[in-house]
Curated annotation (Swiss-Prot):
GO BP annotations listed: adenine nucleotide transport; mitochondrial 3'-phospho-5'-adenylyl sulfate transmembrane transport; mitochondrial 5'-adenylyl sulfate transmembrane transport
Chief place where the protein resides: mitochondrion
Solcar repeat coordinates: 18-103, 113-217, 224-313
Native species: Schizosaccharomyces pombe (strain 972 / ATCC 24843) (Fission yeast)
PROSITE patterns in UniProt: SOLCAR
Domain of life of the native organism: Eukaryota
Keyword Repeat: yes
Ranges that cross the membrane: 14-34, 72-92, 119-139, 196-216, 230-250, 291-307
SUPFAM superfamilies, per database record: Mitochondrial carrier (SSF103506)
Pfam families: Mito_carr (PF00153)
InterPro entries named in the record: Mit_carrier, Mitochondrial_sb/sol_carrier, Mt_carrier_dom_sf
Protein name per UniProt: Uncharacterized mitochondrial carrier PB17E12.12c
């Protein structure tokens, strides 16, 4: 029994949704909203990372080229696929972390994770969300560069002289089908997964650790204001991405490794690292970093703000 506006003998309130389901729904909504908000910056980052020439050299020139070639819709190329991936990605990630957190704290007198638990649970959440949605991640990357003029196929799409060839832009399903049919069957849908895990696992681990640690250390796990949610979310993104960005470059390179016209032909992660360093120097590992920082701060701010807000709203149902 609990005291409330109905008096001391009012029945205890029964939650409408379980904690795991709330985490899943909140995480899915947060990921979808944040990815859509920064879709133009995400597309520019991917183009910077995978290009094999110097066609796209700055944010301004890239904005102009996308606008001239594709119009407004070009800035959101691949976002539909990204949203299809973002919802389950965010849902699995947040639900996994919070499920592990709840189990760990179940029989404890205090409600704070140890630092190593934050890192471990974040890593597991990152691996789980990445593995379950990876084919959609590959498709999103392919669609992002499909009309950017980086491949022989995309040049045909953009070349008016080739209109008679009826080379049509790929869709989500045709992209997945093309990969299966021409790049090695169903296992090809997971090309580059090790490089992706090398990026995603430490990134998600660092983000969960940073947010949880700062929320406990500086705000005593109290409900955060809107500004605090936005600020802390952006801060976690800066820390996580700066420490793991070279792995993100490797991730994108492997996802387009077999596309004709790109020119990359990496055999494994080690050969890719040596080749990038030899041909592009240390700067090659930070291609797209500036545009990514413009993206990651708002995306993580929006993600954590939306997650915390939606989660509280669902708990109050």
């Amino acid at each position: 029994m609990q005291k409330d506006k109905f008096g001391p003998c009012a029945p205890s309130r029964i939650p409408l949704l379980s904690n795991d389901l709330i985490s899943m729904l909140s995480g899915g909504v947060a990921a979808t909203v944040s990815r859509t908000a920064v879709s133009p910056l995400e597309r520019m980052k991917i183009i910077f990372q995978v290009q094999n020439n110097k066609e796209y050299t700055s944010l301004t020139s890239t904005l102009v080229k996308i606008w001239n070639r594709e119009g407004l819709i070009g800035f959101f190329r691949g976002n539909g696929t990204n949203c299809l991936r973002a919802f389950p990605y965010g849902a699995v990630q947040f639900a996994t972390f919070n499920m592990l957190k709840q189990r760990a704290l179940k029989n404890r007198s205090h409600q704070n994770l140890e630092n190593h638990e934050r890192l471990l649970f974040g890593a597991i959440a990152g691996a789980a969300s990445c593995a379950t949605t990876y084919p959609l991640d590959i498709a999103r990357t392919r669609l992002s560069i499909e009309t950017a003029g980086l491949t022989s196929r995309s040049l045909a799409i953009n070349n008016v002289a080739n209109n008679s060839l009826k080379v049509k832009p790929l869709t989500l399903w045709s992209t997945l089908l093309y990969i299966v049919q021409h790049e090695g069957g169903y296992p090809a849908l997971y090309n580059g997964l090790p490089a992706t895990l090398l990026n995603v696992v430490p990134y998600v681990s660092i983000c969960f650790f940073t947010f949880e640690f700062c929320k406990q250390k500086f705000f005593s796990n109290a409900d955060l204001t809107a500004f605090q949610k936005l600020f802390l979310g952006g801060f976690t993104g800066i820390i996580g991405q700066t420490l793991t960005f070279p792995a993100d470059v490797l991730r994108r390179r492997f996802q387009v490794n077999r596309i004709p016209g790109i020119g990359h032909n990496y055999k494994n992660i080690k050969s890719a690292i040596f080749h990038i360093y030899k041909t592009e120097g240390i700067n090659g590992f930070f291609r797209g970093y500036s545009s990514n920082m413009l993206k990651i701060i708002p995306v993580m701010s929006i993600t954590w703000y939306t997650y915390e807000t939606v989660s509280k709203m669902l708990h109050d149902l």
